Design a protein with these regions (language model features):
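Alpha-helical scaffold elements adjacent to nucleotide-binding pockets in ATP/GTP-utilizing enzyme cores
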Residues: 85, 122, 147, 151, ...
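Nucleotide-state-sensitive switch-loop elements of NTP-binding domains
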Residues: 2-49, 58-144, 151-157, 165
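Walker A/P-loop
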Residues: 52
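Long, well-ordered amphipathic alpha-helical subdomains in the mid-to-C-terminal portions
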Residues: 13-15, 215, 226-302
């Protein structure tokens, strides 16, 4: 079975993802030759804002009109076991009846903040497999919002009328990255006030896009059609404004950075770092030790070692 055939089989596609996650960079490079033009949508917001429910409702509607949808849910992981804490996306059970959907939870494997090192690789696999719409659900930690900006074409930021105020939004950095703002759970608080606040604060982007603000009650499918319409409008804007090429370039740069950072983190988490810590305590120069660590990563990687 060749790579193209494997990408058409969900079980084989899962195996491809696992191989890449286990360090198969040749496979990661090969996948890049097959990526197409999937639209990538990052969904972020504080825990409890209804991200999983919203993605499930959006996906259901898209699947009903013959889209092929991939969903990557970033789960916080145990810093001890490295395993996902949340496991499968229990709120997405309604999608089980559809054939053209692929859902995978990704453990951050103890990485503090941000996305998994292999999120971009998994997006590339789904893209190469012909999934035309790919959702990335973030944990909502702050750093992952910055990370998802490097991958997604469109970013949905969820707000809840009962959680926080505009000052907290600014602290989270969400005002700078969002393309569409969804005030979800609109029946649980002063949603109209939150919408007014956002419309006053949000400014037109340098690229010419004016962020949208939409009211939603995702659990009751209220606002879903309007959100999809805004996603479609932003996708057309991305393609017509020249932003698509910039986003693809940003995605590849981020992919390279994440692979390099993962190698460095493996060294930092290994027993080797203990000896370096002892040397620091004994008075060895910090600059020399950092140079040694970087050299070690380069040497081991050049040997094809498991760094």
């Amino acid at each position: 079975m060749n790579l193209k055939e494997m990408l058409l089989d969900k079980k084989e596609m899962s195996k491809i993802m696992t191989k890449i996650e286990n360090g198969d960079e040749d496979l990661s490079s090969e996948i890049l030759k097959h990526i197409k033009d999937a639209r990538i949508i990052g969904v972020t917001g504080v825990p409890g804002s209804g991200k999983s429910t919203l993605i499930a409702k959006l996906s259901s509607r898209l699947l009903e009109i013959n889209h092929k949808v991939g969903i990557l849910g970033i789960d916080p992981s145990s810093p001890f076991s490295g395993g996902a804490v949340l496991g499968d996306r229990v709120r997405m059970k309604e999608l089980n009846k559809y054939e053209n959907v692929f859902i995978r939870s990704i453990s951050t494997r103890g990485k503090i903040g941000g996305l998994s090192y292999y999120t971009t690789d998994f997006v590339n696999v789904l893209d190469a497999a012909g999934y035309d719409t790919i959702f990335i659900e973030t944990v909502g930690t702050g750093q992952d919002e910055v990370d998802v900006f490097n991958i997604a074409h469109t970013i949905l930021v969820l707000q809840v009328p009962t959680l926080g105020d505009e000052v907290q939004v600014i602290k989270a950095g969400q005002l700078e990255i969002g393309d569409i703002y969804v005030v979800n759970k609109a029946d649980q608080g002063p949603a109209d006030e939150k919408i007014k606040e956002l419309n006053l604060i949000l400014k037109k982007r340098e690229n010419g896009w004016q962020p949208k603000v939409i009211k939603s009650i995702a659990v009751r499918s209220i606002g879903i059609d309007e959100i999809i319409q805004s996603i479609d409008e932003h996708w057309q804007f991305v393609k017509s404004s020249g932003l698509l090429e910039k986003k693809i370039n940003l995605r590849i740069k981020y992919l390279l950075k994440q692979h390099a950072m993962e190698k460095l983190d493996r060294i930092m988490e290994s027993e080797v770092i203990d000896s370096y810590a002892d040397e620091i305590i004994k008075g060895k120069n910090m600059r020399e030790i950092v140079k040694e660590i970087i050299t070690k990563v380069g040497v081991e990687y050049g040997k094809g070692g498991n760094v």
